[in-house]
Every structure is written in structure tokens, then in C-alpha cells.
């Protein structure tokens, strides 16, 4: 079975756009709003023979290459369009040990029936350009076991040969540097009876492929290959001695756990980390074992044994390329203070261990201050630099850390760790707010709350979204005429309380409300009246509730269904709007949201039908937006089109050039224009992109280019303080800001 080769795609860094579009184009420069990390970095791959060459993969945010000169990670997959969002989940990375310029990516986010097949991306120039090879395989870059690996490997003796382990499709081989692939039918151990469940707790299939370079000679395929499969209570490590033609289970193996990661030392010792679950679903047991591949002898070298009272497993293990006895291993799910996780260090092949963090490790959070709120977790890859025994890295759910004095552990000294994620931006934007005055931007993101960005090029200082501190922030709004009043809603992170917070000084300080509509009110949407006096919160699955005393008391709004998103008029402090798009209803309040009157929603081409694909539900489509500075002026941004009303929603006019929409927002008017600039994500005149209009949607210009697409984009907002500036909120590539390129 052969893959289909694709086109050659150029991958560039932050560069001015060169654009061609039917509606016109304006070159923009793009940069990330600096958060640093913000998502799961689930794998790091060092090139074994080229100093400074290393790559990182993420579960939903693509892959990165380390830039040694700039001392930052650079994204490699920003060219992926919306249609290929699935490929932003990188299941595995492989480098060619004999050619430092070649790198391979196995891409695909989910294995469910709704998700398209994945692809192998091949590069001969360290990821500057890629060739795409479609394969009949689904990858699970954002599924359980995504931190295992590496599933993809290049034969160190013959770079033409690659092996690929998959979750549900068995073992595959390529003999032409990844251009075509054939299933290895002799490897029959490909299935497991695993209880059905969500993707974050499912089977992982084959989790690593390891070649033994000592078994062959340069220029010919290596005979000995090891494959680990995430099975439990049965054989899960297999060996081939004939280049993959036949396979046998390795005798004596510890089958009571699942293998997670493996490293082959220079002396032929195979080190494997084990757990009762692939992770990051919870592990209840596990260990670290080594196999002397010369003698076939197994040894249990677990640093800290799990118990019934202290259940956990082991995520990863790594060995020093310069010293086959020097190891580090990482725990997963280990209970204790600050999350309980630890690294363990051995310099005698695992006979004895020292805890690295418990032994006095210190951490510098200054490159990403927000991580000081979050325990170290999800250490699913640990690596020792093959050119520097003191330099080690480990990954986390928000990026990772590195040290340059790992060997000090051996002398009983303290290690110093710092954030290593500069350049990696993996947050998911749930809302964007650029107020008329004050901070450039306030972000609402998944998992790590969000930030007030006074400086777009520096990470926000610690604590700027505290009191309360959220995990997810789902809604944020400010008063149109009093923008220092800002309210945000979400769900409190562990150890914190309160699911709604407000600021009266533009985000410099925050406090929770005294009460909430119901004891469990959380998430949902928030609206703030133009004067800041009335707040309307629709908590998740709940009634629309109103407060006029900053949350001291709440009342239920009348005349509007539960769960309906409400927005405020940007001029009239008593007016609010809401919509039930598929029911053809518009709701209007002129009494500060005490009650809503229902009106027919009259669209010139009829109502859209529910169901089918209408984009990501967290995006900015299928919403109404109130125009800044114009009372009663509304834009209806449906997934299938854009509509405008200047009479409080009595009538709407369709903007015919827009045929698909994922996000919508306003920015400062162009010089001499009497209307705010409009920004949208979607399709205009058949061209997909991010667009700006300076004339109320009569004409549009594309402002991104094919090198800057970022897969799925959820939200867009202009800046009311600076014409042309736009903020783009992605699904896994962070938040970006763009400005017109200087001529």
C-alpha cells in the first residue's frame, strides 16, 4: 500500500506577507503575543550527530525547531490551512542520524471516524520546506499516549529505511525515505481489548520503534529492531533480527505494565519506562526496567516504588549518549507537594538513584511567569543533550524546563532549572478583548486563564489574572464607554475560588464578586453595559442572570431562553441583544436586561440549518456583534455568511462576498473613514484567509498569506487604539498580532 506524494510547501518564519487574492491584499508582519508555552509539549528529539539540532512536537500546536543563534524555538507548520487543522497534532518526530538536514513528522490529531487520515511530512532542509505524503493511517496527536514515543524512527545505518508504529493500523515500513509506505504484515500484535472511552483515555497501540545500530553496518539496513506496544498483562516488547521480516516477543519482559518510552544506550542496554496507563490519563502503577540486549537479562531498576497508598507510574527515561550508565527518569501521577512529580538520577545504570527536585532543585520562572501558579506535571519526555551531559530537558503540560548543571546532582549539589519554551506558543484562544483605552489586549484562553497584555512582546507578569485565578476563561467584556470596567467568567483553577472576576482599573487589579447566580455558576458568556453598571452573565447551561451591584445580588432576566449568549449595545447603556439563530429569533432589551422582547430574525436568504459542520463551537461564528460607537448597529456573523443591520436588527443585509466565517471583530477606523475597520476569518470571493475591510464590508483585503495560516483560527479582533493592528486567536498556536508591513 503506497502513500500519495504531495506538493512542496515552503515554511518560513516571521516575514512580511506577499499576497495575491481576488479581493486585494495588504502585506502584514506577524508576531506571537508572548505567553510562552501554554500547552503540552509531548516530545523533544535531539539529533545524535549534529550539535544544536533539535525539534519539539506538541499535541495541537504543530512542531518546532530550535534556533541556536536566536535561542528560541521556531514554528514549522504555520502554513497549514484550516482544512488541514488535523495535521497540527504531531504524533511523532524522527531525525535521520546520518543526515542532519532530514526530519520527518507523523501528523494527525485524532483517530475517530470524523477525522481525516494523517500524513507524513518530509523535509530535507531541517523543516524549512516539507513534502507531504498522505497515508491511510489515523494518528492520535491529541489522544491518550501522545507523550509516548517515538513511534517514527529512521534506521541509523540506512537512512532510506523508516519504521512507523501506529495506534490502530499496525507497523509500517518505508524503504525510500518516507515517499511510500507498506504495512509490515508479519507484525501481528496490533490490537488490544481496551474499554471504550474518550480520546484522552484510549488505547495507544505501538508507542516506540528503536533500531540497534550495532547490529549492522553503514549503508545497509539494521537487522535488529525493537518495537514497544502499549499492552498490559501480555507481551508488549518485540524484536526483529532480520530487519523487520519476522518478529518475536522478547522473553522475560515485565508484562504487568505498559511501556511508555525507551532509550538504547551505547553499550546495548535498553531502558524502558512503564505505567499502568499510557498517560496523561492517570497511572496507578509502573516502573523502570532495563534489558541487557547482549545477554537477554532483565532488571527492575525502579527509582521509587509505587504503592497502593502512593499510586503512580513512570512517564519517561533517558540515557546519556556519552555515558551508558548515566540516566534520568520521570514520574507521572506521583502524589505529593507541588504535584509530587520528580526526576530521578542514576550514574550506575539504575542500581541507585537520587531525586532531582526532591534533592534541592530550584526553578526560574521568569521567562513564563504564569507557570509559577502551576505544579510541574506531564513530564512525558526527558532528554540529555548528546553533546553536553550537564544539559537536560523535560516537557510539561505548559512547555518545559532545562538545566545546564544536571551532573551536579551526582555530587549532591542543587540543580537549577529554567523555562525552555521561548518561541513555543500553544494556547487556545477562547475570547479576545482589545479595549478602547488601556492595555493592548486581554486574552481568555483554555487551561491557563488568560492575561492582560500591556506589552505584547513580553510575557505578562505573574498574578495579573488573579483574584480569582481561572483554568479556562470563556468570556470577557468591557464597558463600551467606560472600558476600565472589565468582567471575565470561567472556572477557577485548583486551589482557587470564584468563577467570575472584575476589574475597575482596566485590568491592573481584580476581585471576585460576592455572590454568583447559583452556587455552581461557571463558564458561559458575559456582557457589560456601555456604562459598566449592568453585567449580564449566562453561566454554562443556566438562565441569563443580571447584576447591577457588581455581583452582590443577581436576578434572572425575563423573556429569554436559558443558555442564550447576550451582548451589550456599545453606546446605549440600557440596551442588550441576543439571538437564537436556528430558531429565527432576535431578543432585545431596553431596560438594562431586566426583560427581553422576542422579534423575528429576518435574514434575506433565510435561516441556516443546524447541524453539519459549522466550524469549532468555541469560535466566533454564529454570533451577533454590536458596532462600537453606533447605537443599534449590528453585525450577524453566521458561519455561512455575514449580515449587517443599522436598525436594531429589524432588517439585515447580506454581504455577498463572504461565504464562510469563523471569527469577526472591529478595529480602529482607517484615516478619514467614518466606520470602524472590520476583521474576519473565513472565505471572501472564494479566497480563504484573514481579511480587513475599511468600508463596512463593501470591499475586503486579505492580510495573511499562505505561510501564516495556523490551522484552526477561532477569534479575531482589531485594536480600537491603532489602525491596522489585528489580533488572531488560534487553536494551539497561541495569539498572534499583525501590523501592516512597513514599505
Predicted regions mapped to residue ranges:
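Bacterial N-terminal signal peptides that target proteins for export
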Residues: 1-12
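Extracellular glycan-interacting surfaces
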Residues: 11, 21-743
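Hydrophobic alpha-helical membrane-insertion segments, chiefly the h-region
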Residues: 16-20
